């Protein structure tokens, strides 16, 4: 097995060499390792022809895994008193959010949180006024379908739309959608951990590990990356389907994967990928036969998943000509390294004493000692079929999170088109976190069983819960967002095309545009079109005549200047615009103690 595994690793690009005292060993070709595996295999058959290749899997109903399969095949009743554990899980998942809950219009920064509020508001606007062009944003004029330049967060947008259309503040709606993700994740992990362990106390620990996972704090600005709660439930739904396949269970599995895809396209794609080794391991351990009922169940799941992926994927496919593909060089810069699983997120309070000199954005992947410790207990032998599948799929997610630094991600990139649009393979780290949280629940269940013999299980529950809460506590730095928009936007109409300066504050302008609806030559998203990147270079010396001509060619009809966001260069820019032919003032005022101006830009002759 070792030689065969070595052959696979070498074939995937893991060729290497090593030195033994007096000897240099070359592992450059898979054929030598494969030949060695064949020789060992023949020798093993010669010595023990009747011993199964995988004796640990057992045979027939006496298999050690059969009891677990029967548990998942049934629909066990909800345990008495479980409601209290659910309440504890939900409250624990929100305890470190308290500073933000007290100030629902505060944000950690003026980038992605503001962008998310604009996304939800723009989707609601299009849904109500132009549903045929649902993904058309008002950024990067004159490109269409600009909501597809990043994750459209369709699930959150559909839920938020009625509130925004009724007049609710989009930023508060977006923040509430953000907050909801934490208890939703905790409930998802609670349910999955309960189905795996049968212990509501262990489920509470699993829910806390998932709901407060370090990945949440690393990505505290990203709305869609908080929505991890469908993933553990989908894994459990797959187990249940393999245990007792029915079309209904297939539809349930498909719906969960579809919901994850609609909430976060990254996680939907990654979940579907990780489910392959996970399902294969469970099916192998349980010796699942390819019956007609299994085919029906999997077909039902596939239909639901295909419909959801196609419905959301089609607009992205249509805009692919503009967006192109992520080159592997760019993917490499957002690929994790194994050592970065030891780099804690900055907001993880218990580890702020550790230097962050070598940490990189998107790659602070340390899950916390409590998570690792409980997961280590969870993977101690003997292993169940589900635990084994979690270990294998977690290892696969870890390998894929390495992206260009790993062995197999380039194959995903080459053979599966959706992966050619993925910018950050390191986000597979969220799936590693899912596995660790579920294994942590298994570890907690083992500790509770061990403590029950001395009647210390209640004390063990309180201590473990307290340790998890302490280990995964967060320090949040928040700031209030502007309570009002600059007064010049009262003169802006939807037919205008704005060039707004300074250029690097696009999320703010996008949020202000929710009220006026004008289009913008600039914008902020996960992808920036070549035309905008070129325009940025052409307006570096704004307000020169050449830069104004570049804005005209880009389609701009008006210019805004915001001195509160610009600072020192602003008075010089205003003087230059006032003295430039073809630029005429439309509106002016003061906002947050500084000048703001709106100018009309005469078109090219």
What would you call each of these model-derived segments?
Residues 18-30, 218-225, 335-337, 353-363, ...:
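Membrane-helix boundary/interfacial segments in multi-pass membrane proteins
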Residues 298-307, 438, 442-471:
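Signature aromatic-anchored transmembrane alpha helix within multi-pass, membrane-resident enzymes
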Residues 91-185, 213-228, 334-358, 404-409, ...:
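Membrane-interface coil-to-helix junctions
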Residues 76, 286-299, 374-408, 449-458:
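Membrane-interface helix-loop-helix junctions at transmembrane boundaries of multi-pass membrane enzymes
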Residues 327-329, 334, 463-605:
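Extracytoplasmic
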Residues 89, 93, 177-196, 200-284, ...:
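Membrane-embedded helix bundles of polyisoprenyl
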Residues 82-91, 255-256, 289-314, 328-333, ...:
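Hydrophobic alpha-helical membrane-interfacial segments at the cytosolic entry of transmembrane helices
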Residues 1, 37-97, 296-303, 380, ...:
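Start-transfer (signal-anchor) and selected internal transmembrane alpha helices
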């Amino acid at each position: 097995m070792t030689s065969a595994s070595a052959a696979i690793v070498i074939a995937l690009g893991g060729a290497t060499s090593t030195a033994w005292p007096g000897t240099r060993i070359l592992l450059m070709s898979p054929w030598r390792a494969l030949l060695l595996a064949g020789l060992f295999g023949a020798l093993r058959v010669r010595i023990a022809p009747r011993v199964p290749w995988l004796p640990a899997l057992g045979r027939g109903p006496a298999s050690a895994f059969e009891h677990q399969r029967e548990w998942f095949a049934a629909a066990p009743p909800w345990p008495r008193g479980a409601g209290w554990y659910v309440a504890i899980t939900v409250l624990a998942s929100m305890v470190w959010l308290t500073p933000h809950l007290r100030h629902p219009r505060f944000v950690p920064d003026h980038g992605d949180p503001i962008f998310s509020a604009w996304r939800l508001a723009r989707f609601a606007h299009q849904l109500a006024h132009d549903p045929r062009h649902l993904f058309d944003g008002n950024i990067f004029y004159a490109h269409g379908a600009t909501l597809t330049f990043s994750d459209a967060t369709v699930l959150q947008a559909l839920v938020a739309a009625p509130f925004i259309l009724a007049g609710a503040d989009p930023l508060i709606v977006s923040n509430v959608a953000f907050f909801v993700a934490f208890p939703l994740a905790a409930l998802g992990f609670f349910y999955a951990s309960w189905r795996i362990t049968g212990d509501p106390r262990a489920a509470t620990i699993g829910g806390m590990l998932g709901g407060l996972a370090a990945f949440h704090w690393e990505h505290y600005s990203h709305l869609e990356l908080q929505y991890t709660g469908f993933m553990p439930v989908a894994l459990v739904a797959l187990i249940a389907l393999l245990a007792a396949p029915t079309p209904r269970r297939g539809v349930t599995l498909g719906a969960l994967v579809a919901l994850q895809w609609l909430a976060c396209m990254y996680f939907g794609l990654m979940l579907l990928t990780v489910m392959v080794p996970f399902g294969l391991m469970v099916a192998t351990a349980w010796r699942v036969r390819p019956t007609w009922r299994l085919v029906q169940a999997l077909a039902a799941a596939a239909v639901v998943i295909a419909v959801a992926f196609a419905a959301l994927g089609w607009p992205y496919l249509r805009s692919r000509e503009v967006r192109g593909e992520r080159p592997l060089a760019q993917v490499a810069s957002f690929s994790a390294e194994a050592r970065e699983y030891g780099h804690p997120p900055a907001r993880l309070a218990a580890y702020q004493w550790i230097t962050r000199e070598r940490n990189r954005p998107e790659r602070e992947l340390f899950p916390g000692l409590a998570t690792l410790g409980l997961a280590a207990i969870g993977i101690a032998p003997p292993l169940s079929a589900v635990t084994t599948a979690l270990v294998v799929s977690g290892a696969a997610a870890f390998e894929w999170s390495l992206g260009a630094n790993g062995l197999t991600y380039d194959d995903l990139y080459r053979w599966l088109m959706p992966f050619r649009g993925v910018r950050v393979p390191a986000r597979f780290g969220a799936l590693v976190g899912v596995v660790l949280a579920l294994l942590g629940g298994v570890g907690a269940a083992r500790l509770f069983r061990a403590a029950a013999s001395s009647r210390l299980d209640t004390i063990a529950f309180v201590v473990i819960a307290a340790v998890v809460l302490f280990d995964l506590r967060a320090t949040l730095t928040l700031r209030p967002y502007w309570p009002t928009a600059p007064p010049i936007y009262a003169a802006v109409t939807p037919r205008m095309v704005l060039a707004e300066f300074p250029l690097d504050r696009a999320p703010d302008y996008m949020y202000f545009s929710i009220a006026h609806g004008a289009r913008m030559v600039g914008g902020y998203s996960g992808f920036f079109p070549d035309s905008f990147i070129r325009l940025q270079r052409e307006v570096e010396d704004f307000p020169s005549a050449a830069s104004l001509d570049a804005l005209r060619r880009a389609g701009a009809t008006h210019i805004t200047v915001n001195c509160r966001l610009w600072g020192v260069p602003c008075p010089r820019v205003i003087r230059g615009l006032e003295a430039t032919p073809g630029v005429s003032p439309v509106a002016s005022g003061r906002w947050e103690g500084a000048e703001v101006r709106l100018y009309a830009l005469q078109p090219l002759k």
